[in-house]
Amino acid sequence: MESLVRQSKKLCPYIGRTSASSLKQLGNGRLTQKAGQCPIMGKAMGVRGFKSDAGSNAESATVDVHAAVDTSKGTCPHAAQYSPVYPSSRLDNYPFGMTQRGLGKVPTQDAHNATTFNYESFYENKINAKHQDKSYRYFNNINRLAAEFPRAHRGSIEEDKVTVWCANDYLGMGRNPVVVDAMHETLDKYGAGAGGTRNIAGHNRHAVELEAAIADLHKKEAALVFSSCYVANDSTLSLLGQALPNCVYFSDASNHASMIHGIRHGGSEKVVWKHNDLADLEAKLARYPKSTPKVIAFESVYSMCGSIGPIEEICDLADKYGAITFLDEVHAVGMYGPTGAGVAEHLDFEHYHSGAQTQRQPIMDRVDIFTGTLGKAYGCVGGYIAGSAKFVDMVRSYAPGFIFTTTLPPATMAGARAAINYQKATMKDRVAQQTHTRYVKDKLANRGIPVVPNPSHIVPVLVGDAQKAKAASDLLLTKHQIYVQAINFPTVPIGQERLRVTPTPGHHEGLCDELVAALEDVWQELDLKRVEDWTAEGGLCGVGEGVEVEPLWSEEQLSYGRD
């Protein structure tokens, strides 16, 4: 905040006359928002890189954007267009040197004669823009059947059944009897809702026990449960940027929207580094003093391409340059490691499986902050953070996304805890999922159907065109009774549209063969590009580029779960 205030006071003569305490009352987000609306400061921000994505220094620019501005009256010409938004009793505390006299009034006649803004037309135009660029999203009415996993029925016609191939219930825990029974028992005893926020009637044994289970899973001192991991990421990252003095974020270019928005809401400087590019990350870290607070935000499994972040190497760089690590394991918890703690645990598999000693500190111990979800491999809903006791307590005490929302229902938390404990005790589901993933990838490769190469459980089938991706999805559903959702912009870049396939333990070889045959039929009917076509064009996303990767799960590790 102090850095933003200093920069603002240098750039704008009206802000320069305002006390730092008054400016701080606006907060990072509001100050930046107000400045962006100003024709003077808005231009300055554009020139000086306030909103740049990577490595810019707002204080290094020298363009004098105020050269032609009359400052003799001491009143901001931009602010003078608006009526007071503060109570009259607080006029002395107006920011930007505003006064009641200087603010003036909106011309009454113009306001009465103006035409009302056409809101519905505006909404329609925004929707039409989505249709025009082929990124409009259609929702399929899919009702997953617990007793027939991975089958579902469409709409209200229960006989219209399809096989679901794109759900994030990776292990089928949403219908696991242990989870369902725990939820039934808790629901019958404690009712449907939590009754309030954690501070007001919503703190209960289920939250305490779930957070203890999560902390133990990641070998951290404490954990905190949120309504979703989107909220967990947004709330935590934004708080870090607001709380740490002169904080700088370092964000992987492929980070999830929840992390991007959390960083944006934090209001601190952001540096984007090329996806999984350690040399680029180090070069950008090296520009800042070691004493500057830094947050390196990245993921373990990137869900749209299946790539895996270099966790150990990023921890090395964090130690070298004085940063903390923020690791999103949303698509990895439950899926990797002997107990399902994620990729960080999996990288020290033997240590956690058999107690083998490592020559270095375990990677899980080196990660400062974990975030994860209860809504994917664990089959429930909710998100969480895990870290040091002091860090978690700070987030608990300051993060609006935690403080001002109703607690998850007791039954949901009981089910999530049951799922975590179940997956801690067995690897059979993870091994079955990995086995089916390899089977599908191998069969598609044999037919030349392009799969983005990766070492994880994600099977991204490259199409490369939004309209064709939707057509392929529709054809799979209507002709083959197979549901695979098309993935388009903004989830993936334009031109990299794909079908995202996620095998589960329930997708046995017979269902896998049906999927492969259906994809072959669709590729022929729509004349979609195969690996050889992408190779001739120079390749894309690793397809047709000679990229080979080894699965993260080794054959030896898979054998442990088959015993």
Swiss-Prot record:
The EC code for this enzyme is: 2.3.1.37
Specify which residues bind pyridoxal 5'-phosphate according to the UniProt entry for this protein.
S303, H331, T373, T405, T406
Keyword Acyltransferase attributed: yes
Keyword annotations for this protein, in alphabetical order, are:
Acyltransferase, Heme biosynthesis, Mitochondrion, Pyridoxal phosphate, Transferase, Transit peptide
Task: Please list the residues that carry the modification N6-(pyridoxal phosphate)lysine.
Answer: K376
Q: Which reaction is the catalytic activity of this chain?
A: succinyl-CoA + glycine + H(+) = 5-aminolevulinate + CO2 + CoA
User: Could you provide one GO biological process annotation from this protein's UniProt record?
Assistant: protoporphyrinogen IX biosynthetic process
Cross-referenced CDD domains: KBL_like
What InterPro entries does the database record attribute to this sequence?
4pyrrol_synth_NH2levulA_synth, Aminotrans_II_pyridoxalP_BS, Aminotransferase_I/II_large, AON_synthase_class-II, PyrdxlP-dep_Trfase, PyrdxlP-dep_Trfase_major, PyrdxlP-dep_Trfase_small
The positions flagged as active site in the entry are: K376
**Top class in the EC scheme:** transferase
Q: Name one GO cellular component term.
A: mitochondrion
Task: Show the transit peptide stretch.
Answer: 1-18
Any Pfam family matching the protein: Aminotran_1_2
Question: Which of this chain's residues are annotated to bind substrate?
Answer: R137, S251, K270, T491
- Give the required cofactors: pyridoxal 5'-phosphate
The pathway entry for this protein reads as: Porphyrin-containing compound metabolism; protoporphyrin-IX biosynthesis; 5-aminolevulinate from glycine: step 1/1
The annotated subunit structure for this chain is:
Homodimer.
PANTHER family linked? 2-AMINO-3-KETOBUTYRATE COENZYME A LIGASE, MITOCHONDRIAL, CLASS II AMINOTRANSFERASE/8-AMINO-7-OXONONANOATE SYNTHASE
What name does UniProt use for this protein?
5-aminolevulinate synthase, mitochondrial
Species name: Yarrowia lipolytica (strain CLIB 122 / E 150) (Yeast)
The taxonomy runs: Eukaryota, Fungi, Dikarya, Ascomycota, Saccharomycotina
